[in-house]
Amino acid sequence: MSVTRDDVAYIAALSRLQFSDEEMATMTTELNSILHYVEKLNEIDTDGVEPLSGIHDQMNVLRDDVEKESIATALALQNAPDRQDRFFKVPKVIG
């Protein structure tokens, strides 16, 4: 399997990306290189090899919560450019 310049142009259009001719050539070459590598990986005999979901046997090893002294609210808000009551006030980001 190989990727053509038209394939890259199609994917770029779907992604709303624009590439120069030089970038288009580079992308085509790099994608073909990646596909070639994947084809090589597919040639490896993995019969009898157990699937690996992680490199460690332990999962979700977490430390215990430890309660400790925190900074005072007034001190935390001391250098805040804008605040409302006991909270930092920040500009609205989501419309």
Swiss-Prot record:
One MF annotation (Gene Ontology) recorded for this entry: ATP binding
SUPFAM superfamilies to which the protein is assigned, alphabetical: Glu-tRNAGln amidotransferase C subunit
InterPro entries xrefs: Asp/Glu-ADT_sf_sub_c, GatC
Entry keyword set: ATP-binding, Ligase, Nucleotide-binding, Protein biosynthesis
Enzyme class, spelled out: ligase
Keyword Ligase: yes
Coiled-coil residue spans: none
One Pfam family, short name: GatC
Keyword Nucleotide-binding among UniProt keywords: yes
Catalytic activity: L-glutamyl-tRNA(Gln) + L-glutamine + ATP + H2O = L-glutaminyl-tRNA(Gln) + L-glutamate + ADP + phosphate + H(+); L-aspartyl-tRNA(Asn) + L-glutamine + ATP + H2O = L-asparaginyl-tRNA(Asn) + L-glutamate + ADP + phosphate + 2 H(+)
Biological processes, Gene Ontology terms: glutaminyl-tRNAGln biosynthesis via transamidation; regulation of translational fidelity; translation
EC identifiers of the protein: 6.3.5.-
Domain of life: Bacteria
UniProt subunit comment: Heterotrimer of A, B and C subunits.
Family: Belongs to the GatC family.
Role this protein plays: Allows the formation of correctly charged Asn-tRNA(Asn) or Gln-tRNA(Gln) through the transamidation of misacylated Asp-tRNA(Asn) or Glu-tRNA(Gln) in organisms which lack either or both of asparaginyl-tRNA or glutaminyl-tRNA synthetases. The reaction takes place in the presence of glutamine and ATP through an activated phospho-Asp-tRNA(Asn) or phospho-Glu-tRNA(Gln).
Listed PANTHER family: GLUTAMYL-TRNA(GLN) AMIDOTRANSFERASE SUBUNIT C, MITOCHONDRIAL
HAMAP family cross-referenced by the UniProt entry: GatC
Protein name listed in UniProt: Aspartyl/glutamyl-tRNA(Asn/Gln) amidotransferase subunit C
Organism encoding this protein: Chlorobium limicola (strain DSM 245 / NBRC 103803 / 6330)
